[in-house]
Each structure stands twice: as structure tokens, then as C-alpha cells.
Amino acid sequence: MALRRPMVAGNWKMNGSAALAQELFKKFASKLQNDSAEVVLCPPSIYLESVRQLLEANKEALDGSLVRMGAQNLSQHDFGAYTGEVSGQMLKDSGCRYVIIGHSERRRMYGETSNIVAEKFAAAQKHGLTPILCVGESGPAREARRTFEVIAEELDIVIQKNGTMAFDNAIIAYEPLWAVGTGKSATPEQAQEVHAFIRKRLSEVSPFIGENIRILYGGSVTPSNAADLFAQPDVDGGLIGGASLNSSEFLSLCTIAMSA
């Protein structure tokens, strides 16, 4: 069985401030001297430099830990007349190691199709970033028992465009749309069922990838339900939304992941 290091990735969405970043580091910089879990901070792009500076300033306090920086989105294009967009190279230059791709809010609010998501996945890897690929079903799809079908379609398009081995340098986040920002989380059993399906799906084309890829759960994760979720055999941590904005809650989630 592969030893997959748990990950807790905090997606601030369009929230936070430079002051929040300082508060987070003040809270956990000296308490994360442990590399048993990886912590990724994904602030809005405007605050990436603030977080980068805090990582550097707290380098000694964070010694022995794995705290990284990630972005919430990137353009599928390398450069050009794309007002408001940020390229993979720009994110790499900013110090990012990870980037969230295909979040349900991007798909739903900004019309990102699975083809665009696959292109962004490729753009991330082209510039040395590790994509955190989000997949998940809507409430109606779950009620219609189409969860596996929807997720398979979302995975397959990325595989078709990028190849299976592209997942050797990728993270997957299962985020059921009916749980994102609703306060209603999937049960540990529901999460495990879907994570096991994703792992099996990838194992069919590459046993190595299937066994080693990290699969995060995202959708109303809190300190009260994280231990049970992270204890599932195919759940390798969480993509955290609201709780990542609360320094105490986020530290609790990191601590839970470190003992999972």
C-alpha cells in the first residue's frame, strides 16, 4: 500500500486580506514543525506576494514543516490579450507550487467546460505547477444515481487530452457540488465510496497512478467532521473553503491531517 502524505489545501476564494495572512502565520508558524502532512495556502492572486513574504519571513519557524503556496485559477493561455487573466508562468514566478483547476464555482459561474479545464491542467504542468483537479456531481446528478458517470466523464476528458501519466504530478479533489459552501458535508462513507471509485478508475489505466495519487475531499469540511473523513482509506486530506479563513479552525484541520 502506498504511503500518501495527507494534504490540507486552504482555498480562500474571494476572501481574506493581508492581515488575515499575517494572523494565520502568527497562529500556526511555530506549531506546524511536522512534515507528516502538507499544507497549501491558496489566497486570491493579489495576496500571493504577501503570503510568499510571510513564508520567507517565517522560514525558521516553519523548518521541518511542508507549507506551500497555491493559486485558485490560471489561464489556459501562456500570454496575450486576455485582460484580467494570469498565466502559469506568472504564478510560477510568484512562488506558487500548486494551482486549483476546475473548481465547481469556476465551472458553474464562468462557464468553464471540461475541455477548458483539461487545457488549464496542461498549462499548469507546462509551467511546473501541480494541478489540484476538482471533480464532483450536482445534487440532481446524485439523486439520479449519476455520480460515478459524471466524475468519470470529467476525469476522462483530462486523461484524453493529457495522458494518464500526467496524473503522476497532480492532485484530485472530490467536491460534491451539493456540499460546497452549504454546510452539508458528505458522510465519511459517501466520500470514501467516491474516492475509491476515482482511485479504481485511474488504476485501470495505470496501477501506479491509482495507488499513489492523492485524492482530497472538499465540501463543508470542519474540525468536527474532518477526523472521520480523513480516516477513510482513500481520503488523503481536504480542500478547505470557509474553515481556511479561520486561523484556529484551519490549524485544527492541519493537526487532524497530521495524525490521520
Swiss-Prot record:
Main location: cytoplasm
Keyword line: Cytoplasm, Gluconeogenesis, Glycolysis, Isomerase
Positions that bind substrate: 11-13, 181, 220, 241-242
Class of enzymatic activity (EC top level): isomerase
Family annotation (SUPFAM superfamilies): Triosephosphate isomerase (TIM) (SSF51351)
Active-site residues, record numbering mapped to chain: 103, 175
GO molecular function: triose-phosphate isomerase activity
Catalysed conversion reaction: D-glyceraldehyde 3-phosphate = dihydroxyacetone phosphate
CDD domains membership: TIM
GO cellular component terms listed in the entry, alphabetical order: cytosol
EC number: 5.3.1.1
Presence of keyword Thylakoid: no
Domain of life: Bacteria
Quaternary assembly: Homodimer.
Entry function: Involved in the gluconeogenesis. Catalyzes stereospecifically the conversion of dihydroxyacetone phosphate (DHAP) to D-glyceraldehyde-3-phosphate (G3P).
NCBIfam families on file: tim (TIGR00419)
Family: Belongs to the triosephosphate isomerase family.
Official protein name in the record: Triosephosphate isomerase
